[in-house]
Amino acid sequence: MAVWAYDLFEIPEDPAADAAFRRFHASVESYWPPERALVTRRYADLLFPFEEISVPPVPMTAAWSLERVLGYLSTWSAVRAFVKATGEDPVAAHAPNLAAAWGDAGAEKTIVWPLVLRAGRIA
């Protein structure tokens, strides 16, 4: 049995862009649905009646431009909830700061999503 999800992405090759993304996330974090906390806590609170299997870290990676990242952020349920609650688009509001930190908007950066995974077998 396994349960998995991916956590917030990181931009390890560019600390300035990563920090700008973290600031963006902080602005919408309270708008995530409550069940998102399971992922944030890496499924630690999930009743898991199986013999745990140790799983090595498995990241997902992609090379994305700033435009692609901004488009992706716009799909988040937290962003949609923010817009519904405030009438404002947080992606548009943060885009100038994200762009300044990113540099060349056409440049692709390596985006890394840590995989959140619990695996086990029936004992």
Where do the model's predicted regions map?
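Conserved Class I S-adenosyl-L-methionine
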Residues: V39-A123
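Conserved catalytic/acceptor-binding region of the Class I
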Residues: M1-A63
